[in-house]
């Protein structure tokens, strides 16, 4: 089965072709980072308009790269949520229109299920069951995964997602959007130990997260330094390092608890923050001590992309899941509501 995948949940337009027998044939992506940078964050209306502009050219590019034509495609998978409603509607409308024109099925895919399954596109994919850490700008969740569609939420953030905390902290210190990579880059030049921030909710049982207080601690420290006349680049880097260390250690502690609670030895990390090298190193060290394994997608598939949507959709389409031609998207969509295969 050859599936065309469309991703438009936020500020990346992603298109890919995945074949159930040959694997990933082609993928193309257009990032809107430059478009939104001047505003310090994603502007929903601008995101939607740019998806409209990019979608069809990217589909043509992907078909050409895979040496395929429209009649070769067996089905279309598109992101139906969660995400920005206007942006989601662009992908959904395009998918349903093409499905009608080409007389093939279309299926809306859960954005975070796409992220969760992205490591399965790698040469050494994880095997069920495993614990997944979904960590991005909009989500920070620990999920037990027993199969596709078989998800048990173990814990999630009570306020800011980890990626959101990265972005907001970077913005408060005058760094460019997106803030996560900027914090990581600055942290490489930071001096360890100059600042120490709390590891939120690690002093109590449970698998919930909270990052708003940590963000506030970083802001207060930056303001205190500025008030004292020290707003140097080195101070910014030192705060970035301390902030990143706090987030990474918090996520690592919670992942270790989740593995102990479930008795599992395999951990999947997915979502934009999973590309963070410090986080990967910390989790790999922790899993090494437990004689377990950690899995993640290649860096370009950690952020939003069409490949993960094409793959996730293919798994469901192959067992006959499909929908009518109505267009329905969801800004919020608990993953536990998904059906199992």
UniProtKB/Swiss-Prot annotation:
The lineage of its organism: Bacteria, Pseudomonadati, Pseudomonadota, Gammaproteobacteria, Pseudomonadales. One of its GO terms (molecular function) is N(6)-L-threonylcarbamoyladenine synthase activity. Substrate binds at residues 134-138, 167, 180, 276. One of its GO terms (biological process) is tRNA threonylcarbamoyladenosine modification. InterPro entries: ATPase_NBD, Gcp-like_dom, KAE1/TsaD, TsaD. It catalyses: L-threonylcarbamoyladenylate + adenosine(37) in tRNA = N(6)-L-threonylcarbamoyladenosine(37) in tRNA + AMP + H(+). SUPFAM superfamilies: Actin-like ATPase domain (SSF53067). Belongs to the KAE1 / TsaD family. This is tRNA N6-adenosine threonylcarbamoyltransferase. CDD domains: ASKHA_NBD_TsaD_bac. Keywords: Acyltransferase, Cytoplasm, Iron, Metal-binding, Transferase, tRNA processing. The gene is tsaD. Binds 1 Fe(2+) ion per subunit. Its EC number is 2.3.1.234. Its cofactor is Fe(2+). Fe cation binds at residues 111, 115, 304. It holds the Pfam family TsaD.
